Structure formats: C-alpha cells, structure tokens
C-alpha cells in the first residue's frame, strides 16, 4: 500500500473527548474515528490490526480443536427469559439493547451468546457420543454502556471472540478450560503483551471457576492483587487474603459510653483509644430484587475492613429465592431520600449496632419487614469489641457475640482484600497491586444454562442429563487498544511486531529525487514479495512530516532512502528504541527478516 493512496489523516493535537493515551493516539494516528457516543469506525490501519489479532486468536482456537461458526446478533427475548437473564440484562445491569419488531416481538442485540448456543445444543446434541464439542465465533457485540469511554475499551459495540463448549463430565470440562487457559496465554504472548491471568468473579454470566486475562497498564480500569512468587493473582472483586492480626482489646467490661461526634471509625478509635481491629462496624445496604421487593441488609464487619460490593451482591443473589425473586436489580447504601421511603423513624447513622430493631422498617408490601443480617468472618471471633448502641452519640464497648449481641446466622466473606494483606497460600507473602485491562475471560458454567433451557443429552447409562458448559471470551478490539495503552511514548504508538498494521514503512524524503524513488520502489516490491508487510510513504510532504507520522502511527521499522544512498546505503530505524543504523541496500531484506523473526519468537 502506498500512503499517497490511503485514507489517512493524522492530528497534531489530542482530541477533546479522549481521556487515556491509547484513545488519544488511535484517533490522532488515524486508526479510528468517533461516529457517536461509544461508536467508532475502524479505518484501514485499524482494520489491519484487528485482522492480525483475529488471525492469532483463530490459530490458537483451531489448535485446540474448536470450530468456528457465526451466530445471529438479533436474539429473541424468549431465549433470555428461559435462562432468567432478560431482566438482569435489560433492567438490572441494563446493558442489552432491546427492541420490538413490527410483529410486537421483543428482541435483543447480543452482548453475549450463551442462550443462542444452548438452544442450538438443545436441538442438535442427543448423545454422549457427540461430546465434547466446542464452537466459537468472532463477531461484533453490543452493550448499552451507561458511560461509554476510553475509545474501544468501553464502547457500545465491539469485536469479540466468544466460544462455548459442551461436555458429558467435569473432567472433560476442566480439560477444555485448561486448554483455553493455555490458548489465551499463547494469544497474548504472541500479540507481544505483558499480562496476568487472575481469579475472577463470574458476574451475570454465572458458573463456578472463572479467570480473567489482564493486560498490565497504568490506565487499566481493574485493580489486580497478586503475590511476587507468582502463585496468586486475582482481581479486586474476587481477591481473598488474610487481614492483619487483631490487636488486644483495651475494653475489659461491658459499658455504654457517651461518644459525641464519633460517626466515623477514625474518630471512634481516637476517642476510645482503641484499634479499628477492636470495632464491629455495621453497614446498611438496600437491595432491590427483580420482583420489586426491597431488602434492608445489615453487614457487620471488622472496623478496619471494607465491604466488597461484588461479593455482597453474589451473596444476595444466592438468597433471591428467599424473597421469591431471581436476581438483584440494584444494590446501594441508601441515602436520605431512599431512607424516607422505608424508614419508620430516623436511623442512628454512625452509631448503628448489630441488633438494630426491625421496627425501623415501615410496613410495606414492597419492603421486607426484617433486616437481613450477616456477619463477615473478620468480625466473628472478636471479643470485648466496640460497636454502635443504636443511640446517637453513644457506643457500646466490651461487647461479645452470644452475650450482648446474637451472632447473625449468615456468616459470609464479603470483605475487600487490599494491598499489604497477607496471602492465604503463604502468610509470609503480602499482596501487591497493579492496574490491568481485562481482554479475556474464561468460565466453567456447569449446568446453569442447560438446566434452565432444557438442554440435555443421553449419557452412557441411558439417562437424560443436562449438558455441562464452558464459555470463553476475548475482546479483540479491546486487546488491540490495550496493546497501545501498554506500549507508547511521547512520539506515538509502539506496536508489537505481531499485530502492527505493517512491519515496515519506507519513507522517501524527497519525491523529486529519482534515485530515492527507484530504490524505495524496489525495496517496497522486494519486501512485500518476501511476506514482510510494507507500506510506502510516497506523499508529497516534507521529510519531517513523514518521520513524525511514522513515529505516531507506530510501524516497528522505518527505512529511509535519504542521503546515505550516495554510499549505497539506507537508514533503518527501530521504532521501539529509536536506534538508527545504516545498511547496504542489498542487506535490507535479510536484516529485516532477522529482526522480525526475533521479535515474533
């Protein structure tokens, strides 16, 4: 391709709407254009990157025996209602674009395809002899993001590889899961990215085992906790750890003390001369289920710890059946306005005790009449602790479970792990933190969808049983931008060789110099014929403009047919290091072959 023929416009200034470096650079370098909020066009350079990432993904998937297919983007609402996810995706998370056709039928634009693939399996798979089977697709997906941002990182449409496997037993499912773990690691290594595989929450997808693949980058939306020994890594939503040890309690006897102006843990510790580890704090949440019922949740947790909202949401989702519901639509700490709708009297905020009376809740069909009380494991074994008294300006000290307060029946792990905590696998190790961009996620779904949708097969014993499932996703367009977020400098993008739109750019400093044009043209032909993706900058522009654009666009290697031609040489500049060397024209092909082969190892 000749740049003089390509649709390419580069910008010198950062676009106003872009927040992170990769977003700014992809727009400035002419890779993408914003069409609407969270909607982008992939211009020729970007599509080449997408295609190269897709090729790597396909090769690794095919190597595992997975088969490529293409599933419909429009999905009937009935399928999602069967699985029980329609309300979750159109109301709770609200990320599915839904529409009504001219026959008054509800449809959704697919953010994911578990329901569709399960329906296909239900219709086609009859016997254990057909198992295991693994299908995947590369396709545009849609999400009605509340706040689209960061370009391709969080758009309303995106390109994704999603795969789904079906199995007769757990052993087979685990083998495919392990195969996908290996395949995903290979995809990211081959793409030239630094990454971590981390334990993750299954979220609305569901299932048991779940792992995310994070590209490490300072602008990553996700926080990762890991140990230096490489034996543990998890995202913040899923991470577990051992908190610091409890300090000896300074409270010998039970008492109620006046503690004015101590609504926070910090002020309480200062007033009572105690450690936050000696306190049981009680955090009030309001959960709204999909049947409209609100449940007031009181979480008792050690004073130096925070509640992990995702872990709490998972606990409440598991309890949905107790309230004749299927899922949680919303979870929040109720503000003053929310409290007015259900509070029978003013709450003693900042001084709430574990036994806050149920008579604080107004009688209503839409509100559960009793607090749902749960205690985090960090608070269970505290003795002689301090806590609220349910009276403003007063706290209880020297309290114990089973004496002054009944221990809640629901003992849970809802604490948020944090940097500096001790590792569970080795308490001598502490958790470190890093930022990451999620580009892949694999799940062991089990029978969640097959049971809900009646997808069964006949096993070796002649019994009809639900199919076991796994699902595996890679954000192709997100991975491409994540590569930029991980590798750039003040001059522009530094593409990994494997996914760069072109390996080489040949710059002609003076298009009026016939020797420069001739040598550049011959090299352009020779390199492309040898399988080296090469683009020729033959534009009628100043040399400085061409060099700046080459750095901005991020092509790994630049050949300049400049003054050194007088001695039969050209300049070779490596984008990642800016190192420049002069090589004779006859050695350009062999030199570049060696450099590219080395980079791809």
UniProtKB/Swiss-Prot annotation:
Protein origin, superkingdom: Bacteria
Residues passing through the membrane, by range: none
Keyword Mitochondrion in annotation: no
Record has Protein biosynthesis as a keyword: yes
Keyword terms, alphabetized: Aminoacyl-tRNA synthetase, ATP-binding, Cytoplasm, Ligase, Nucleotide-binding, Protein biosynthesis
CC terms in the record's Gene Ontology section: cytosol
HAMAP family: Pro_tRNA_synth_type1
NCBIfam families per the UniProt record, alphabetical: PRK09194.1, proS_fam_II
Protein role: Catalyzes the attachment of proline to tRNA(Pro) in a two-step reaction: proline is first activated by ATP to form Pro-AMP and then transferred to the acceptor end of tRNA(Pro). As ProRS can inadvertently accommodate and process non-cognate amino acids such as alanine and cysteine, to avoid such errors it has two additional distinct editing activities against alanine. One activity is designated as 'pretransfer' editing and involves the tRNA(Pro)-independent hydrolysis of activated Ala-AMP.
Family from the record: Belongs to the class-II aminoacyl-tRNA synthetase family. ProS type 1 subfamily.
Name of the protein: Proline--tRNA ligase
UniProt source species: Trichodesmium erythraeum (strain IMS101)
